[in-house]
Amino acid sequence: MDVAEVLDRIRSIPPGKVAAYGDVTPGAPRHAGRVLSEVSEPDLPWWRVVRADGSLAKGYRQKELLRAEGVRFRGDRVDMAECRAACGSSARSP
C-alpha cells in the first residue's frame, strides 16, 4: 500500500472514532506507524490511529484530542468495541 492510500485511510476515520494501525494497513501495522512518523501534514488526524488494544502512544496529546471528539475510554485505553471505525474493506467495525 502506498503512502497516499495510507493517508487517505487515516483521513477517512471520522471524528469520535479510531482505527488500529492494522486497520489502516491490514497485515502490516508497522507500515502505518512508519508513514505517520515520516509525514508532517498539519490536517492529518494522526490521533485517531491507536494500537489494536486501544492503548495510546506516550508523550503526545492523543488522549486529549480524542476526548475532545467524544471518544470513550476504559481507563487509559480507547473503548475499541464502541469507537472503532471501519477503515477500508478489511477493517473490523463494532
Regions found by a protein language model. Name each.
Residues 1-94:
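Nucleic acid-binding interface residues in structured DNA/RNA-binding domains
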